[in-house]
Structures are given as structure tokens and as C-alpha cells.
Amino acid sequence: MKERLDVLLVKRNLAESREKAKAVIMAGNVFVEGQREDKAGTTFPDTVQIEVRGHVLPYVSRGGLKLEKAIANFDVSVDGKVCTDVGSSTGGFTDCMLQNGARKVFAIDVGRGQLDWKLRQDERVVCMEKTNIRYVVPEDLGEPIDFSSIDVSFISLTKVLEPIRNYLKEDGEIVALIKPQFEAGREKVGKKGVVREKSTHHEVIEKVALYAQSIGFKILNIDFSPIKGPEGNIEYLIHLKKWPNPVEDALLEDLSLVVDRTFETLAK
């Protein structure tokens, strides 16, 4: 009898849940009969030899590794802060915030039933399912927010930054994922939704950054996400700080250098 690789990992107690199993598999840490396997849906006989190598994923999903990089490289602190995790899904970002000392996290997502059970049970987490961030107002949260992460799909960041800015404290900060496949025009997105042209990456980062500046955010940092998105899409982390007025100063680093460094590292 054959079963999916993620199911086999759970059955053998090599992962706590199928979501965690998928994360470990996609991270390239699972070997079947000595060969690396990175597709959770591949089926194998239930007698096959499976080995998990490398570090155990410290969060409920691999998304936590993205925020972990931002916290480390951008000198972001969430210790003792009230946060929102916009596009929370399973809760990798929420988990990362809690493990870095966040006092409270509002996990906001348009979907339902996705947030990991461990986080649902945590009294520091407020689960806001079936909630469209575009219509969230400060009164819905009931308290000022110090920090927000954003990891949304099928929508541009230019549609969600302003409502989040409205509920942030005056010195509030954001770490958001820029996903070229959801920012570029349809004609610039290739097969399987992958954006391969460097010039398009430059364009979409610039578009998001200039928009953020125009509504009162200062760009503090931009770097690539350590983990690719579905189908191998390269994504970027942008670090923003709420500013009293529109910001016209230049970006910290020439965007072409950011994109060049990203492609040298990830486009293999």
C-alpha cells in the first residue's frame, strides 16, 4: 500500500502534523531510501525507509523562518509588544513572534480552520478567522498595535498597507513579504506563476516601496526571503516604520544591488 510522504511522516511520529511534515519536506530535510524528496504528495510504500536530517523546524510552519531572518538581520524587536500577523495561515509568523517575546498576537486571515491547534490554545493569541484585513479598523482590535507582519497571496501589498497603518502606533513597524507573482502584471508572470526576470523583480519592489513611502512609511530594510514560495518563486522582506508624513528620501540600498544579490544566492 502506498501513501503520501507527509502522511507517512506523521504516522511514524517524524512530524506532529501534516502541515509540519510538509514544511520539513519542502525545506529539503527528508530523505527516502537515501534520496532527498521535496514533494509532500509523492507516494511511497509504507515499508520505505524515511530519514529526517538537519535541524527540526522550530515553528508550526516554515513561514516562521522568514520572520526569523527579518528579526535577526533587520534588528527587529517584538519583545513585550502587541502584534498582528496578517495572512496568518498556519501561524508560522505568529509562532515566531511568540518565541521572540511578543505579549499578544492577533492572527488575521480570510480563511478558516488553518491556524495550528497549539496557537489556538495559547492565551496570547487572538484568532481572527474569516477576516479581510482591508476592512479591519482600530476598534476591531481594541488596542494600539506595535508591530505587524504581512504574508498575503493573490493581492498586492498596495491594497493592505493603508488599513494596517491606520491601526499601528505612531512608531509602529511592519515586516512584509513582497511576492512578485502577485505584484507584477499578468503578462510578466511566467509558467506556473513564476516571475523569472530580474527587471520585473526590481519593478515590483520599487512599486511597493514607493507606495509605502507615499502613505507615510519609511523604508528601513529590504532583503530576500530565505525560503522560496510555491513553485520556486523568490520573495522579498521589506521592513517599514510608520512616519508622520509621506517620505521622499531614497531607499537604503540601490534596488538593483538587492535583486542582483538575491539572484546570485537563490536563482539556481
Task: Go through each PLM region and give its residues.
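S-adenosyl-L-methionine
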Residues: F106-K159
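Conserved class I S-adenosyl-L-methionine
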Residues: V78-S89, M97
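Flexible, glycine-/basic-rich loop-and-beta segments that form/coincide
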Residues: I234-K268
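Glycine-rich SAM-binding Motif I of class I
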Residues: G91-G92, G113
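A basic, amphipathic helix-loop patch mediating RNA/tRNA/ribosome contacts
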Residues: M1-V48, V82-C83
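A short glycine-rich, Lys/Arg-flanked "PGG" loop and its adjoining helix->strand segment in the class I
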Residues: T158-V175
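Short, glycine-/aromatic-enriched active-site segment of Class I SAM-dependent methyltransferases
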Residues: P180-E197
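Conserved S-adenosyl-L-methionine
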Residues: C96-K104
